[in-house]
C-alpha cells in the first residue's frame, strides 16, 4: 500500500520557525518586506498570489502586489523593477512568470538584483545553485521538494534520482539541488527514449512533465519516493498532478499528492527566502 506524504506539515514547520525569526526582527525595528510583480490577471497567478499573501502575512512579512497592465512597455517594466532594486525597504522581489511575450525575459532577468531575487530569475542565482553556493536563492519549487525530503527524513545521498523535466524554473535546478546532496541524477525530457524504463529504476522520482496523470505504475518501482510537481486539470476539470496515484496505490511507494503536496510548501519557501534576504541586508 502506498504512503501519501502531504505538504502542510512541512509548510507549517517552516512557518513556525520563520514567525520566531520575524518576531526577533521586530524587536530590533526590522520588518521584512516582499513585493510581488504581476502583469495582467491570470487565474494561476492570482491563485498563487493569494497563497503567498496568506502565508507571508501570517508570518509577519509585509507583502505588497504591484499589478501592471498586460500592455506595459518593456522600458516601463524595467524602470519599475529598478525602482524596487533601489528601495532599501524592499527585501524580496517576486516576478510572476512567464511574462507576456513582448517583455523579453532574457533581458529582464539580468535587471533584478540577485540579493532580492527570491525565486532565482537572475542567472547569477542559478549559477550559485549549480555551484552549490548557499548564498544564492534556488527557485522555490525545487527548494520545496528538498524541504519535503528533509522533513520526512528521506536521504538522497547515494540514491538514483530521476527528474522529468528540464525547465529553468523546476527541472534543471531540481537536478542540481539533488546532485549537490550527493544523489546520482538523470534528467529526462520530452525527447528521452524509453522513459518508463529509466523512471522505473529511480529511487527518487521527481515528475514535472506537465501532463495530467501521465506517470502510472509502470514508471515507478517498489519502494520508490515519488514527488509530483505537476499542476494540471484532468478530464473532469479537477486539479491533478503528473502522477496517477490510483494506479500505484497497491505498490510500496511514497508519493506527494496534488493538490496538497509540493505547492503547499512553495509559499513557505518563498517566505523563507524573504527572511534570508532580510537577514543578509541587515547583517543579522
From Swiss-Prot:
The alphabetized UniProt keywords are:
Amino-acid biosynthesis, Histidine biosynthesis, Hydrolase, Methionine biosynthesis, Multifunctional enzyme, NADP, One-carbon metabolism, Oxidoreductase, Purine biosynthesis
Residues holding NADP(+): 165-167, 190, 231
Pathway info: One-carbon metabolism; tetrahydrofolate interconversion
Q: Name one Pfam family in it.
A: THF_DHG_CYH
GO biological process terms on file: L-histidine biosynthetic process; methionine biosynthetic process; purine nucleotide biosynthetic process; tetrahydrofolate interconversion
Question: Per its record, what are the GO molecular function terms?
Answer: methenyltetrahydrofolate cyclohydrolase activity; methylenetetrahydrofolate dehydrogenase (NADP+) activity
Q: Which GO terms describe its cellular component?
A: cytosol
As its record notes, the protein acts as a catalyst of: (6R)-5,10-methylene-5,6,7,8-tetrahydrofolate + NADP(+) = (6R)-5,10-methenyltetrahydrofolate + NADPH; (6R)-5,10-methenyltetrahydrofolate + H2O = (6R)-10-formyltetrahydrofolate + H(+)
- UniProt-listed Enzyme Commission number(s): 1.5.1.5, 3.5.4.9
| Oligomer and partners | Homodimer.
The record's listing under HAMAP family reads: THF_DHG_CYH
Q: What family is this?
A: Belongs to the tetrahydrofolate dehydrogenase/cyclohydrolase family.
Question: What PANTHER family does UniProt report for this protein, alphabetically?
Answer: C-1-TETRAHYDROFOLATE SYNTHASE, CYTOPLASMIC, C-1-TETRAHYDROFOLATE SYNTHASE, CYTOPLASMIC-RELATED
Q: What does this protein do?
A: Catalyzes the oxidation of 5,10-methylenetetrahydrofolate to 5,10-methenyltetrahydrofolate and then the hydrolysis of 5,10-methenyltetrahydrofolate to 10-formyltetrahydrofolate.
Name the record gives this protein: Bifunctional protein FolD
Organism lineage reads as: Bacteria, Bacillati, Bacillota, Clostridia, Eubacteriales
Underlying gene: folD
Amino acid at each position: 500500500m502506498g504512503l501519501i506524504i502531504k505538504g502542510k506539515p512541512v509548510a507549517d514547520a517552516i512557518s513556525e520557525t520563520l514567525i520566531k525569526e520575524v518576531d526577533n526582527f521586530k524587536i530590533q525595528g526590522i520588518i521584512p518586506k516582499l513585493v510581488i510583480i504581476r502583469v495582467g490577471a491570470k487565474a494561476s497567478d492570482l491563485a498563487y498570489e493569494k497563497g503567498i499573501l496568506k502565508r507571508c502575512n501570517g508570518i509577519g512579512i509585509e507583502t505588497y502586489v504591484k499589478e501592471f497592465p498586460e500592455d506595459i512597455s518593456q522600458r516601463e517594466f524595467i524602470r519599475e523593477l529598478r525602482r524596487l532594486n533601489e528601495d532599501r525597504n524592499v527585501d524580496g522581489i517576486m516576478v510572476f512568470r512567464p511574462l507576456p511575450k513582448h517583455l523579453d525575459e532574457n533581458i529582464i532577468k539580468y535587471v533584478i538584483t540577485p540579493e532580492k531575487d527570491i525565486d532565482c530569475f537572475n542567472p547569477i542565482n542559478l549559477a550559485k545553485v549549480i555551484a552549490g553556493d548557499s548564498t544564492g536563492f534556488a527557485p522555490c519549487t525545487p527548494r520545496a521538494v528538498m524541504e519535503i525530503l528533509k522533513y520526512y527524513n528521506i536521504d538522497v545521498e547515494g540514491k538514483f534520482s530521476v527528474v522529468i523535466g528540464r525547465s529553468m524554473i523546476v527541472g534543471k535546478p531540481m537536478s542540481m539541488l539533488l546532485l549537490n546532496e550527493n544523489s546520482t541524477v538523470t534528467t529526462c525530457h520530452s525527447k528521452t527514449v524509453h522513459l518508463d524504463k529509466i523512471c522505473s529504476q529511480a529511487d527518487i522520482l521527481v515528475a514535472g512533465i506537465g501532463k495530467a496523470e501521465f506517470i502510472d505504475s509502470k514508471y515507478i518501482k517498489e519502494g520508490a519516493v515519488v514527488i509530483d510537481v505537476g499542476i494540471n486539470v484532468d478530464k473532469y476539470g479537477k486539479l491533478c498532478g503528473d502522477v496517477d496515484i490510483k494506479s500505484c496505490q497497491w505498490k510500496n511507494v511514497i508519493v506527494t499528492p496534488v493538490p496538497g503536496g509540493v505547492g503547499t510548501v512553495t509559499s513557505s519557501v518563498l517566505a523563507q527566502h524573504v527572511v534570508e534576504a532580510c537577514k543578509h541586508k541587515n547583517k543579522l
